[in-house]
Amino acid sequence: MNPNQKIITIGSICMVVGIISLILQIGNIISIWVSHSIQTGNQNQPETCNQSIITYENNTWVNQTYVNISNTNFVAEQAVAPVALAGNSSLCPISGWAIYSKDNGIRIGSRGDVFVIREPFISCSHLECRTLFLTQGALLNDKHSNGTVKDRSPYRTLMSCPVGEAPSPYNSRFESVAWSASACHDGISWLTVGISGPDNGAVAVLKYNGIITDTIKSWRNNILRTQESECACVNGSCFTVMTDGPSNGQASYKIFKIEKGKVVKSVELNAPNYHYEECSCYPDAGEITCVCRDNWHGSNRPWVSFNQNLEYQIGYICSGVFGDNPRPNDGTGSCGPVSSNGAYGVKGFSFKYGNGVWIGRTKSTSSRSGFEMVWDPNGWTETDSSFSVKQDIVAITDWSGYSGSFVQHPELTGLDCMRPCFWVELIRGRPKENTIWTSGSSISFCGVNSDTVGWSWPDGAELPFTIDK
């Protein structure tokens, strides 16, 4: 091959290589453009993934779904119109109680940042259930937990966290400054009632969607106090019961009707010889039933039921299966206060089913220990002590405490009835144990018409803690 042919051959090869390289570069550019177009086109397409977050903006619940596309997060939003909880359904028929939650707050608090609390309770919206609780402005196993046996102080606040979680600074939200409280959701927003201030002039601050909407001043100047459990909502109105006056004698009791955080009506009960404290209230077929604590002279529980116009009836649970603590052994009941061991008491609850009643109570007749549910098929109206079902919740050898009712509306469960539920406070520390603090964890159960089991679900923390030694 002569020199000219070599030059032509080499030039041809270089040209072919150059053309191939150019084609590859053009293909690469086209590929990048197509990929970018696909990503851009998908930005406004909601897709399914595993993480959803609920936020609240301008009285509209917003479902935010995070969509992962090529390591980039986009947010697809779909508004859910708020609807007031009807509250018109009857209680669901049940045969027993299934465990719903247990927070193990004291066990976790031995090494973790967990609030010192008391008076926990549960309330549900149409989207979620939350545990509400009164903190002492302190953490377990810390010096500020000293002396937290005290009920009323300026450091106490109402806070909330997702049900079943130990209450900590990392999962809890502030609700109100309070040493006595109630809260509930009307289907549109949360209503909180927080009482704070001096014993002779406390004020209840009402908040709706976190904003102060009204206040209620102590009218007897003697420790204004409320339920320590959820209020009850029907057709956009929420109802709560408050007490003002002696804890060991005749006091004053009022029912309040609240709409969007504003008191629209109230009535004082005409209830001589009755004593109502720390009522546990629930809606049933459009009306409200509250079962309360008689701290004056009754070892059975007083009740008040009322309609949305606050027309009310009052009475005591007649059953000889007594529900308060302290109390006598079961025997002959009364539709008025049973005076034997009637002084003092503990917050509790019952659910009325016609003439029958589910009674929640401590197992011990003299101390806040153990817990059980008892079904008395005639107990709302009859005075005998016969019952047909008893389900163990906490063994008598383990501490219990306050207990109260809450419900899950059909808008949450999808059922055609109101599901009855209850929680039990498991108090630990002072005055019964050798610690510098008083706090508690909680368990909860919901009524079902299927298989259940009796057992013991105690607090389970090993005391004392490091701070106590």
Curated annotation (Swiss-Prot):
Locations listed in the record: Virion membrane; Host apical cell membrane
Virion surface topological domain residue ranges: 28-469
Post-translational modification: N-glycosylated.
Glycan-linked positions: N50, N58, N63, N68, N88, N146, N235
Family label: Belongs to the glycosyl hydrolase 34 family.
SUPFAM superfamilies: Sialidases (SSF50939)
Swiss-Prot/TrEMBL catalytic activity: Hydrolysis of alpha-(2->3)-, alpha-(2->6)-, alpha-(2->8)- glycosidic linkages of terminal sialic acid residues in oligosaccharides, glycoproteins, glycolipids, colominic acid and synthetic substrates
Keyword annotations: Calcium, Disulfide bond, Glycoprotein, Glycosidase, Host cell membrane, Host membrane, Hydrolase, Membrane, Metal-binding, Signal-anchor, Transmembrane, Transmembrane helix, Virion
Key word tRNA-binding present: no
Organism: Influenza A virus (strain A/Parrot/Ulster/1973 H7N1)
Membrane-spanning segments: 7-27
Function, as annotated: Catalyzes the removal of terminal sialic acid residues from viral and cellular glycoconjugates. Cleaves off the terminal sialic acids on the glycosylated HA during virus budding to facilitate virus release. Additionally helps virus spread through the circulation by further removing sialic acids from the cell surface. These cleavages prevent self-aggregation and ensure the efficient spread of the progeny virus from cell to cell. Otherwise, infection would be limited to one round of replication.
E.C. designation(s): 3.2.1.18
Record-given protein name: Neuraminidase
Residues on Intravirion side: 1-6
GO molecular function terms noted in the UniProt entry: exo-alpha-sialidase activity; metal ion binding
Classification via HAMAP family: INFV_NRAM
Disulfide linkage: C92-C417, C124-C129, C184-C231, C233-C238, C279-C292, C281-C290, C318-C335, C421-C446
GO cellular component: host cell plasma membrane; membrane; virion membrane
UniProt cross-references to InterPro entries, sorted A to Z: Glyco_hydro_34, Sialidase_Influenza_A/B, Sialidase_sf
